[in-house]
Design a protein with these regions (language model features):
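Ser/Thr-centric signal marking residues that sit
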Residues: 42-45, 74
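Beta-hairpin "wing" of winged helix-turn-helix
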Residues: 53-67, 72
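Short, hydrophobic-biased segments on the C-terminal half of alpha helices
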Residues: 47-49
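N-terminal helix-turn-helix DNA-binding core of bacterial DNA-binding proteins
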Residues: 2-42
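Residues that scaffold the ATP/ADP-binding catalytic core of kinase and kinase-like folds
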Residues: 17, 80-81
Length: 101
């Protein structure tokens, strides 16, 4: 799979995982696991990239004596999900054309 396409898919999967409620790293990995194997290091790279792109913001909370970062989707992140859905539909139309006999 093309690296840019894969990166886009991973980014949107992470955004989707935090769309309805703020979440933290381990829970995000657990939430996307049914559709995607995601390592911790890959997730944190994605989260950093999304934060730099203003698609999410980070809130630090002390939980059971430990620091936990919660990630919250921004309007830019919500917009990216919608853009991706539109782009994916176009890709699916192209795919149908290619595999058609």
């Amino acid at each position: 799979m093309d690296i840019q396409l894969k990166r886009g898919v991973l980014d949107v999967c992470v955004l989707k995982a935090i769309k309805n409620e703020d979440s933290y790293g381990y829970k995000i990995i657990k939430d996307v696991k049914p559709v995607l194997e995601l390592s911790e290091s890959t997730l944190y790279t994605i989260l950093k990239r999304l934060e730099e792109a203003n698609m999410l913001v980070v809130r630090v909370v002390i939980h059971e004596g430990r620091i936990r970062k919660y990630y919250h989707i921004t309007e830019n992140g919500l917009k990216r999900i919608e853009e991706f859905k539109s782009e994916w539909k176009e890709l699916m139309d192209i795919y149908q054309f290619i595999v058609e006999e």
